[in-house]
A protein has these predicted regions:
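The alpha/beta-hydrolase serine catalytic core
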Residues: 75-187
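Active-site catalytic motif of lipid deacylating hydrolases and related acyltransferases
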Residues: 2-51
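A short, charged/proline- and glycine-enriched loop
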Residues: 1-2, 119
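Short hydrophobic segments within beta-strands
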Residues: 4-8, 58, 125-127
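Residue in the alpha/beta-hydrolase core beta-strand immediately N-terminal to the catalytic nucleophile
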Residues: 55-58, 75-77
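Gly/Ala-rich beta-loop-alpha elbow adjacent to hydrolase catalytic centers
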Residues: 58-68
Length: 187
């Protein structure tokens, strides 16, 4: 199985290395793709092109948002995804108004395009310290297919357990053979 681990330069997360190690231990083929935030407008299209040759797409934090923006219904695992990066980044002086405008456009397109198949194909993992607005927005757009972790920081053993659950979830979905028949996973 092939995995694409998406990263945004200067927004990397320590969990990315642990996630990579987990999937390497399962003999998954892992490709890491790193983007500059200044290239935000191009990221969804590049990910869409890359999606044809992978089984799972994974992103943490800001990278999780861009994983959600990819419109193909690949299996997606997002950890503490930033659901509205335009709001989070609008307070930073180093982020231009033009970039905020681009992010708002991607947000609108991302959440307007969510359909039943995309809901089932998306699995979210949230830690206790994740922004509650992000959790609520994930639930609103993608349904109940998420796993909450009560810890502020995900220890390796806990991360391993929730990643195992995500793989079990997707194995169950694939076994069903019909993504759209699994409406029980969302509200």
């Amino acid at each position: 199985m092939k995995i694409l681990l998406v990263q945004i330069k200067d927004f990397e997360n320590s969990l990315e290395n642990e996630i990579k190690a987990f999937f390497e231990s399962k003999n998954f083929e892992i490709k890491c793709k790193s983007f500059e935030l200044s290239d935000a407008a191009k990221i969804p299209e590049v990910l869409l092109q890359d999606s044809v040759s992978i089984d799972y797409m994974i992103g943490v934090g800001l990278a999780g948002f861009f994983v959600l923006s990819e419109t193909n219904s690949n299996s997606k695992i997002v950890v503490n995804p930033w659901m509205s990066p335009s709001q989070k980044l609008s307070q930073k002086e180093t982020v231009s108004h033009d970039l905020i405008t681009i992010l708002k456009k991607i947000e609108t397109q991302t959440y307007d395009w969510v359909d039943a198949e995309m809901r089932v194909a998306t699995y979210g993992i949230f830690t206790h310290d994740a922004n509650s607005c992000d959790k609520e927005m994930f639930l609103k757009n993608y349904g109940r297919n998420m796993n909450g972790v009560d810890n502020y920081f995900i220890e390796e053993e806990i991360l391993t357990n929730v990643l195992e659950k995500s793989l079990e979830y997707f194995a169950h979905i694939r076994k069903q053979g019909d993504w759209q028949s699994l409406n029980l996973f969302y509200t």
